[in-house]
């Protein structure tokens, strides 16, 4: 993702503005990629509440509104770090995040490990994550543009795996069964346990564990 200096300046000047009004005034800024700028402005506005440490960092790139809504908050990412840190047995050298997304969980959890892998099948999210990890000096994180199941099948065993299944079906509707999430961790259980000493799974409280 490459933004021109004019677009970056527009983002800086309008980062607290109402994006609906900006969209209506797009014709006033012929040298600015207004749609791309609005994605960045909305992303930063969400991050100010959700991920304040990143919002305060100049140069962070943000994904679309849906990805920002779905990503972990700084508070919940730190909670996962505490889970890993409080686990007093086993090695903590290698870590793989199979559902990378915006990269919040991977960025925070990678601090616990010597080597980390961020896996994501959406190329745009990989590009954003690679930029942000470099900006944050997270040199221990490798970005992998790959399907999570295919990567899991091919990867070498690691100490920890993190996976956050999407609770949406192919039509964007919400699911209530673990088996309907993407990926289906119930079907991958044996392979996950074969590939990692510890597996940390984030599940929505809205899921019905009896299904």
Where do the PLM segments sit?
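SAM-dependent transferase fold signal centered on methyltransferase-like domains
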Residues: 1-211
């Amino acid at each position: 993702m490459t933004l021109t200096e004019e677009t970056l300046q527009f983002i800086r000047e309008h980062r607290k503005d109402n994006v609906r009004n900006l969209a209506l005034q797009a014709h006033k800024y012929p040298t600015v990629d207004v749609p791309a700028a609005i994605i960045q402005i909305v992303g930063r506005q969400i991050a100010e509440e959700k991920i304040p440490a990143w919002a305060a960092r100049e140069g962070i790139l943000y994904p679309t509104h849906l990805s920002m809504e779905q990503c972990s908050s700084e508070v919940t990412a730190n909670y996962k770090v505490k889970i890993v840190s409080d686990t007093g047995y086993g090695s903590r050298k290698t870590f793989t995040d199979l559902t990378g997304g915006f990269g919040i969980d991977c960025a925070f959890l990678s601090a616990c490990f010597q080597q980390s892998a961020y896996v994501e099948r959406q190329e745009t999210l990989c590009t954003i994550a690679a930029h942000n990890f470099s900006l944050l000096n997270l040199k221990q994180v490798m970005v992998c543009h790959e399907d999570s199941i295919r990567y899991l099948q091919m990867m070498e065993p690691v100490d920890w795996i993190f996976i956050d299944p999407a609770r949406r079906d192919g039509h964007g509707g919400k699911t209530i069964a673990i088996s309907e999430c993407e990926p289906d961790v119930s079907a991958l259980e044996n392979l996950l346990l074969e590939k990692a000493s510890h597996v940390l799974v984030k599940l929505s409280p809205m899921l019905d564990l009896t299904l």
